[in-house]
């Protein structure tokens, strides 16, 4: 689990905008302090030195996340990956 930054604002289209401390991969799961899934990384934009992240929320009221710190969880964390035979 990696800290990605604080939520700055909510777009009219319902996306959360976060200023990135560490850049996650597109498609990674995003969780809050309580490890509750809040969305997925949709886009990364802005200058390379201080990028912004657009997160597509999966919760009914994303406005409650304004000002909160979010974390990225890679797909392999918390799961065991075995090849099916």
Features from the language model and the residues they span:
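Peripheral interaction segments used for macromolecular assembly
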Residues: 1-85
């Amino acid at each position: 689990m990696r800290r990605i930054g604080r939520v700055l604002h909510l777009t009219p289209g319902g996306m959360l905008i976060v200023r990135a401390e560490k850049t996650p991969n597109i498609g990674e799961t995003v969780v809050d302090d309580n490890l509750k899934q809040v969305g997925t990384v949709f886009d990364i934009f802005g200058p390379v030195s201080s990028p912004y992240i657009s997160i597509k929320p999966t919760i009914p009221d994303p406005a409650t996340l304004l000002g909160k710190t979010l974390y990225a969880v890679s797909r392999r964390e918390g799961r065991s990956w075995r090849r099916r035979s």
